[in-house]
From Swiss-Prot:
The gene is Usp32. The lineage of its organism: Eukaryota, Metazoa, Chordata, Craniata, Vertebrata. Belongs to the peptidase C19 family. CDD domains: EFh. PROSITE patterns: DUSP (PS51283), EF_HAND_1 (PS00018), EF_HAND_2 (PS50222), USP_1 (PS00972), USP_2 (PS00973), USP_3 (PS50235). Residues 1360-1370, 1415-1424 have a biased composition (Polar residues). GO terms for cellular component: Golgi apparatus; Golgi membrane. One of its GO terms (biological process) is positive regulation of TORC1 signaling. Residues 734-1567 form the USP domain. Deubiquitinase that can remove conjugated ubiquitin from target proteins, such as RAB7A and LAMTOR1. Acts as a positive regulator of the mTORC1 signaling by mediating deubiquitination of LAMTOR1, thereby promoting the association between LAMTOR1 and the lysosomal V-ATPase complex and subsequent activation of the mTORC1 complex. It is an enzyme of class 3 (hydrolase). This is Ubiquitin carboxyl-terminal hydrolase 32. It comes from Mus musculus (Mouse). A lipid is attached at residue 1601 (S-farnesyl cysteine). The modification Cysteine methyl ester is found at residue 1601. Residues 1602-1604 form a propeptide.
Length: 1604
């Protein structure tokens, strides 16, 4: 595509320069510098975008770039100039040589036909027929022959048509002058263009303070009040807000300031009249006059001390006197003219006008017209502040006296003092804005209660300057003129202007000329007032610097003080190198407001972890604990000044925002010494109370990525060297250190720790009497011992936090899946913890064999009692007593109706949350009648298609489905039309809108004559009255990229055949779609450009339109249709409304339409009809009566610049009405569910799918079935797990559904299986005592566990250990009564857990035992072969195998499960049985009857059973994203107070502060239980010797730890 060097060697750079003027060359150089920066080369991308424009086809642009000499390095400026001169001012001979060079060979001496045809195919897509004449004599031609042929065939191809035929369409310079936004505003106001440019910067800074993004009354009010009274703020806002949209745009504030401050007196009084005309009816009623008088008297009292008669008169008398003297209509009100006559000589009205004058300049940013005016404005503001006195919470600013005196001379400031009363710069003294000198006292520092001086001006303003420039509607030099005074003052902040000032005071002979007019001062220089900081650290606060203490600064001699509004104005007008804000506070002793000049200067340290060596490693399996040989290094990072009255909480919040660190991830420590730090955790303490003085060191601690705290980890690592300081705390209110993403463990431990019966069991040491160190599936008692030691520390009441090192190590040893530093599932850890505690404390040391029988139609109570008895024979512990309940699971065959029932134990209920099966969609409907768009809210199925969306939306908005066109709008244009058969997408490139389109009618032949009535009524503009047999003509042509809402009769060929070189000619013979796309467009002018086509670039804005257009639509109809839709955006003011414009010279509405329609391509930038080399922005559509043949093009609505600047209401673009369905759908989407609904869903009947066929023992085959779970027995401690992590559609997702649950008196009895009281009998079903040696199971009645092996991998299906059985983890094969719950969608080989589970848990490991997880497909088959072969083994083998595999699996780190078929097979069911509860109410486990509770009576048990009411005592909450996030616990202490356990932090809080929305696990305790009844008797029992356990632990501990 061209050579690497320029092909324009025939035109030299020097010759090209002679053809451009100096002005043009400077513009080109500046444009090149703006585009390329300091580089001498322009990239190809910049060349295409900035020089040629986006309308040139990419292939053509690439050819031109290469022909100019562009390479991969770029295009040199000299080559660019030569190329531009050739294109715009080259001679035909030179252009012919250029075209020849494009096709010539490397040598440039001839053109080869094959090469030329190849390039023409690339550029034009075809080869002209006349080309064969050029090569009639051979395959090569020289320049002469090529030139002769080219001049005879100038229209042969694109380049020849562009450069040789039809004249020049692009020039080097564009002399047209489109008015800029500022020029337009300056033409209709009394403001200069420079004033408007300067005012715009201020406007965007003020608007940036809005919370809504609009300059509304909520934003405007605090800015002007005080000094404007709140009663007048709304009226003043309305006076600016001409279009009454509750938003002051820049045009309105410019015109309002012009009318209020720069116009003649009569016009200024007009503005005041609008302030008092509340109802905007053009007159002041009696009520409005009374309110006006009240407001004016308040203004007078605030600003003047003079006495006037009106102060002593009755309000009604004043109103009557005004009406009697000036009411010309004699109807009891004042017109505008009446008000003007009254206000001319009225002192109250004039004083109000003076106040507005001050506010408009100081607050709203208008620059004073003269220095004298500036001095009067500032003086008036300071006089009023002197009457108010110092107000706590306000900031005052220090200004160097040297600059202040120079400014006073410049503005001719009156030197008489302005006294502020009371003054508190000195204790009880007064200060004035005069020359009186007062020293600063050093004895008592004055401090700020405005944290960090966040309201100061300098930083906030500098951060927002860019937004002001971006808002400008002209680019290049249109916004900021570097030579204007306003620009210099706003951006030249750092230079010292004293030299300039001295020069201004010297005459030509060197004599001082003090009598001359003083020179305008430069930027405010406060540097002499502050000390040079020796500490080189970043300051986090904006106090500006520490004031000098020596020599002593004296007020009135060294500095002056001004209130914040005055400082902002001076800063805006002059700039400053240093802002010195100082706040006003109340003295804690005298309660007198005072100004703090010397706030506390604090030094902040940050941790810098030391580099670890191989010897100083981290703890293996323990967390990120550093070595004691590598202590944490702390370095000075920041400084900051804060008030002594500031609380720790306020400082913490400020630092969090300033450093962009989450509050929960940062803590503050008081640094006393290297080894003595104090955590500042009491947020209500003030610096004064803590006796924190200047230059005190504080440590900013930030969490590690693994959620541990560096200081804590360092303390743990050095705990042998540093004495732990005992701090008395509430028992149980002790946190747990995060050892590296162990918040999941801490949360579960805290919940279990606050289970009072279990905690009392451990605190009393009873666990040491029941340690089972011989249990093959236990943990040798280590789990119980470590947990017991930790509980005793937590409830000792001597430590604020402890590190659970031993328990963490024990868990990691026996469950490696919890090892490492990744976030885990708190529920999984809880299950493992309870399981480990149970096995270590199991009172059954030799487990007997039990038999699992089929229900065979037996009563539920009998089967349940049998299952419970079987479990109790093998499992007895404090964990079983407290946490275990029983579930009934029944499966009903849909073929024969046979019901199979089994009962399983559970220790927590896992309730699947209903996943969001609906998506919430809000869509805006835009109608053709121009009414305000309406937003509708819908709830759609997740797989809903746009067809269904149309139907639902049609029912809401009243349009037929055929009238709705969906479009994705992005960057003010339509990017895509979704097809009806596509699924609705929430994440689209833009936002989805629904446009109304004309109803398609029956198709009409384009060739047949159509009789139409072309007359149109004014209401329809002739757009919808064209009929053929009473119907609208059916659209039969669909342009490229448009939706097939209507059936096309044409083909795609109609479109593509018409495209030649990017040129789309008119297609008058092609039918239309019935509508076309219209986009709003404005021209953005730049003064730095390369070609005339790029001086004014189109820019799209606003919302695109859908305009009706058929084969019969006239051009005038298009204008009418567009105006109908946009008139609400550009409505002229009501004729009776007084305008704020100084002179309304806007004639944009004088003609019919304030815009012009042009035919453009889909991108809206270039013409759809003209070829690219014409550089046409769109052919104009005349507003005439002839037909509008638009074809498949779009139209651009080009707004007249004056109308756009003065009449177009940008804020109205975003105005939509919200239909009631929006709130309804939002509420439905976010509506929480209650716990009862979760339980109801859990116990509801479900149908098993075809992939979950149930093997029916009656039908002897797999059948379809239904399944139902029910609660049979509830434990004293009920744990409810809300399954937020679920596997849906192949991926893990977290449900954010809010679940409402009761805290007190939770009654789940409605979900218990009803009992038949006639069958209840207290019949012993188990032998008395602990000896089960005589219990044997016949071999013929049991089935073996099927062990499936595949590729060397072993999948063993086992029973869960008793404490690991959750309600939803029912461990039976598909179709069995205990198969997985319907609502818990699962993934293969994964347990019902979070995706944070270890890979060891989720996958198969060779040589390891793997347990099937919930929903797993790897379950025991129900096939007949398995059933038959399983009869060979006996129950003894089964139980032996189960115990062995359980032990091996626990040691491997996973939770065991046993899954066996119910029919004819054994299941090691974890059920309880009490002899007396075979038909009990099932409300509670009550007390065990076979070992230590023989003395309990049946009456006590019956009482317990009759109260299944629970109270909440602990919550584990998960916040954040899936796969991460954070766990915290809320628990109720025995002192009846709630505490928040956030790792090592434990704080008391009010119950209403609990974050219940993120609840994950709920812990309920049954009302009325006696903790003592669960404590076993230790009489006659021997405490276990744990010395060997300690030795074992220490031995293993040292293997994993490098600490000594």
């Amino acid at each position: 595509m061209g050579a690497k060097e320029s092909r324009i060697g025939f035109l030299s750079y020097e010759e090209a320069l002679r053809r451009v003027t100096d002005v043009e060359l400077k513009r080109l150089k500046d444009a090149f510098k703006r585009t390329c920066g300091l580089s001498y080369y322009m990239s190809q991308h910049c060349f295409i975008r900035e020089v040629l424009g986006d309308g040139v086809p990419p292939k053509v642009a690439e050819v031109i770039y290469c022909s100019f000499g562009g390479t991969s390095k770029g295009l040199h400026f000299n080559n660019l100039i030569v190329g531009l001169v050739l294109l715009t001012r080259g001679k035909d001979e030179e252009k012919a040589k250029y075209i020849f060079s494009l096709f010539s060979s490397e040598s440039g001496s001839y053109v080869v036909r094959e090469e030329m045809e190849r390039m023409l195919h690339v550029v034009d897509g075809k080869v002209p027929d006349t080309l064969r004449k050029c090569f009639s004599e051979g395959e090569k031609v020289n320049y002469e022959k090529f030139r002769n042929w080219l001049l005879l065939n100038k229209d042969a191809f694109t380049f020849s048509r562009w450069l040789l035929s039809g004249g020049v369409y692009v020039t080097l310079t564009d002399d047209s002058d489109t008015p800029t936004f500022y020029q337009t505003l300056a033409g209709v106001t009394h403001l200069e263009e420079s004033d408007i440019i300067d005012l715009e910067k201020r406007y965007w800074l003020l608007k940036a303070q809005s919370r809504t993004g609009r300059f509304d009354l909520e934003t405007f009010g605090p800015l002007v009040s005080p000094p404007i009274r709140p009663s007048l703020s709304e009226g003043l806002f309305n006076a600016f807000d001409e279009n009454r949209d509750n938003h002051i745009d820049f045009k309105e504030i410019s015109c309002g300031l012009s009318a209020c401050c720069r116009g003649p007196l009569a016009e200024r009084q007009k503005f005041c009249f609008k302030v008092f005309d509340v109802d905007r009816d053009g007159v002041l009623s009696r009520v409005e006059l009374k309110d006006m008088v009240v407001a004016l008297l308040e203004v007078w009292k605030d600003n003047r001390t003079d006495d006037i008669p009106e102060l002593h008169m009755d309000l009604s008398d004043i109103v009557e006197r005004i009406l009697n003297a000036h009411d010309t209509t004699k109807v009891g009100h004042l017109t505008l003219e009446d008000y003007q006559i009254w206000s001319v000589k009225n002192v109250l009205a004039n004083e109000f006008l003076n106040l507005l004058f001050q506010v408009c300049h100081i607050v709203l940013g208008l620059r004073p017209a003269t220095p004298e005016e500036e001095g009067q404005i500032i003086r008036g503001w300071l006089e009023r502040e002197s009457r108010y006195g110092l107000q706590p919470g306000h900031n005052w600013f220090i200004i160097s006296m040297q600059w202040w005196q120079q400014w006073k001379e410049y503005v001719k400031y009156d030197a008489s003092p302005v006294v502020i009363e009371p003054s508190s710069v000195l204790n009880g003294g007064k200060f004035s804005f005069g020359t009186a000198a007062h020293p600063i006292e050093h004895g008592e520092d004055r401090i700020s209660n405005n944290l960090g001086y966040m309201n100061t001006t300098e930083e906030k303003y500098s951060d927002n300057i860019s937004s002001a420039s971006e808002a400008s509607e002209s680019t290049g030099s249109g916004f900021l003129y570097s030579g204007t005074p306003g620009a210099d003052m706003c951006f030249a902040r750092q230079h010292n202007t004293s030299d300039n000032n001295n020069q201004c005071l010297l005459g030509a002979n060197g004599n001082i000329l003090l009598h001359l007019n003083p020179q305008k001062p430069g930027a405010i220089d406060n540097q002499p007032l502050v000390t040079q900081e020796p500490v080189k650290a970043t300051s986090l606060t904006l106090e500006g610097g520490r004031l000098k203490r020596t020599p002593q600064l004296i007020h009135g001699r060294d500095y002056e003080m001004v209130p914040e509004p005055v400082w902002r104005a001076l800063y805006h007008w002059y700039g400053s190198n240093l802002a010195l804000p100082r706040p006003v506070i109340k003295n804690s002793k005298t309660d007198i407001p005072e100004l703090e000049l010397f706030p506390r200067y604090l030094l902040f340290l940050r941790q810098q972890p030391a580099t670890r060596t191989q010897q100083s490693n981290i703890w293996v399996n323990m967390g990120n604990v550093p070595s004691p040989n590598a202590p944490l290094k702390r370095v000075l990072a920041y400084t900051g000044c804060f008030s002594r009255m500031q609380t720790i909480k306020e400082i913490h919040e400020y630092l969090s925002q300033r450093l962009r660190i989450k509050e929960e991830d940062m803590r503050l420590w008081l640094y006393n010494s290297e080894n003595y730090l104090t955590l500042l955790d009491d947020e209500d303490h003030r610096l004064e109370y803590l006796k924190i003085q200047d230059e005190q060191h504080l440590v900013i601690e930030v969490r590690n990525k693994d959620m541990s705290w560096p200081e804590e980890m360092s303390f743990i690592a050095n705990s042998s060297k540093i004495d732990r300081h005992k701090v008395p705390t509430e028992k149980g209110a002790t946190g747990l250190s995060n050892l590296g993403n162990t918040c999941f463990m801490n949360s579960s431990i805290q919940c279990v720790s606050n289970t009072q019966p279990l905690t009392q069991y451990f605190i009393s040491g009873r666990h040491l009497y029941e340690l089972n160190r011989t249990n093959p599936i236990g943990m040798k008692g280590h789990m119980a011992k470590c947990y017991g030691d930790l509980v005793q520390e937590l409830w000792s009441g001597t430590q604020k936090n402890v590190a659970p090192l031993k328990l963490r190590w024990t868990i990691a040893k026996y469950a490696p899946r919890f090892n490492g530093f990744q976030q885990q599932d708190s529920q999984e850890l809880l299950a493992f913890l309870l399981d480990g505690l149970h096995e270590d404390l199991n009172r059954v040391h030799e487990k007997p064999y039990v038999e699992l029988k089929d229900s065979d139609g037996r009563p539920d109570w009998e089967v349940a009692a049998e299952a419970w008895d079987n479990h109790l024979r093998r499992n007895r512990s404090i964990v079983v007593d407290l946490f275990h309940g029983q579930l009934r699971s029944q499966v009903k065959c849909k073929t024969c109706g046979h019901i199979s029932v089994r009962f399983d134990p559970f220790n927590f209920l896992s309730l699947p949350l209903p996943m969001d099966s609906y998506m919430h969609l809000e869509i805006t409907v835009i109608k053709l009648d121009g009414t305000t768009p309406i937003r509708y809210g819908l709830r759609l199925n997740m797989d809903e298609k746009y067809t269904g969306l149309k139907k639902q939306l049609s029912d809401l908005c009243g349009l037929k489905s055929e009238q709705i066109l969906f479009a994705e709008v992005h960057s003010s244009n339509i990017k895509n039309f979704p097809q009806d058969n596509q699924k609705v997408r929430l994440s689209v490139s833009g936002f989805l809108c629904a446009f109304e389109i004309p109803i398609p009618a029956s198709p009409v032949s384009a060739c047949s004559p159509i009789q139409t009535d072309c007359s149109s009524s004014p209401s329809t503009n002739g757009l919808f009255t064209l009929t053929t047999n009473g119907d609208l003509p059916r659209p039969i042509f669909i342009p490229n990229g448009m939706p097939n809402t209507v059936v096309p009769c044409g083909t795609e060929k109609n479109v593509t055949n018409g495209i030649v070189n990017g040129h789309m000619p008119p297609l008058p013979d092609d039918p239309f779609t019935g509508y076309i796309i219209a986009v709003h467009r404005k021209m953005m002018r730049t003064e730095l450009y390369f070609l005339s086509s790029q001086k004014n670039r189109p820019s799209l804005f606003g919302m695109p339109l859908i305009v009706p257009c058929t084969v019969h639509t006239r051009k005038k109809d298009l204008y009418d249709a567009v105006w109908i839709q946009v008139s609400r955006l550009a409505s002229p003011l009501p004729p009776q409304e007084a305008s704020n414009h100084a002179q309304d010279c806007d004639d944009s509405m004088g003609y019919q339409y304030p815009f012009t329609l042009r035919v453009v391509q889909k991108d809206g930038n270039s013409c759809a009809w003209c070829p690219w080399y014409r550089f046409c922005r769109g052919c104009k559509i005349d507003c005439g009566e002839d037909r509008a043949f638009i074809g498949n093009a779009c139209i651009a609505v080009d707004w007249d610049p004056t109308a756009l600047h003065l009449r177009y209401q940008t804020s109205q673009e975003r105005v939509v009405e919200e239909h009631e369905s929006v709130e309804q759908s939002r509420r439905a989407q976010a509506e929480p569910i209650n716990l009862d609904s979760c339980l109801r869903a859990f116990t509801s009947e479900e149908e098993l799918g075809e992939n979950e066929m149930y093997y029916c023992s009656k039908c002897k085959t797999h059948c379809l079935a239904t399944k139902k779970l029910d609660l049979w027995r509830l434990p004293p401690i009920l744990i409810i797990h809300l399954k937020r992590f679920q596997f849906v559609n192949g991926r893990w997702i977290k449900s954010q559904k809010i679940v409402k649950f009761p805290r007190e008196s939770f009654d789940p009895s409605a979900f218990l299986v009803p009992r038949d009281p006639t069958l209840c009998q207290h019949k012993p079903l188990t032998p008395q005592g602990d000896d089960f040696s005589e219990l044997r199971i016949p071999a013929g009645d049991v089935k073996k566990v099927d062990i499936q092996s595949s590729a060397g991998e072993e999948d063993v299906l086992l029973s869960k250990s008793p404490s690991s059985l959750s309600a939803n983890v029912t461990s039976s094969p598909k179709g069995s009564p205990s198969s997985s719950r319907k609502s818990g969608a699962s993934c293969p080989s994964s347990k019902n857990s979070s995706p944070n589970s270890s890979p060891r848990t989720l996958g198969r490991n060779k040589g390891r035992l793997r347990l099937p997880q919930i929903g797993s497909k790897n379950k025991l088959s129900n096939s007949k072969e398995n059933l038959d072969t399983s009869k060979e083994n006996g129950a003894g083998q089964i139980c032996e195998l189960a115990d062995t595999l359980n032990r091996r699996h626990v040691l491997g780190g996973s939770q065991p499960e046993l899954v066996t078929p119910l029919d004819h097979e054994i299941t090691l069911a974890n059920g309880f049985l009490y002899e007396h509860e075979a038909c009990g109410n099932g409300y509670s486990n009550g007390q065990l009857g076979n070992h230590s509770e023989e003395d309990s009576t049946d009456d006590q048990r019956e009482e317990t059973h009759s109260k299944p009411i629970y109270n909440l005592y602990a919550i584990s909450c998960h916040s954040g994203i899936l796969g991460g996030g954070h766990y915290v616990t809320y628990a109720k202490n025995p002192n009846c107070k709630w505490y928040c356990y956030n790792d090592s932090s434990c704080k008391e809080l009010h119950p209403d502060e609990i974050d219940t929305d993120s609840a994950y696990i709920l812990f309920y305790e049954q009302q009325g239980i006696d903790c003592a009844q669960f404590l076993p008797k230790t009489d006659g029992k021997k405490m276990a010797d744990t010395s060997s356990m300690d030795e074992d632990f220490e031995s293993d501990y040292k293997k994993y730890c490098v600490l000594q």
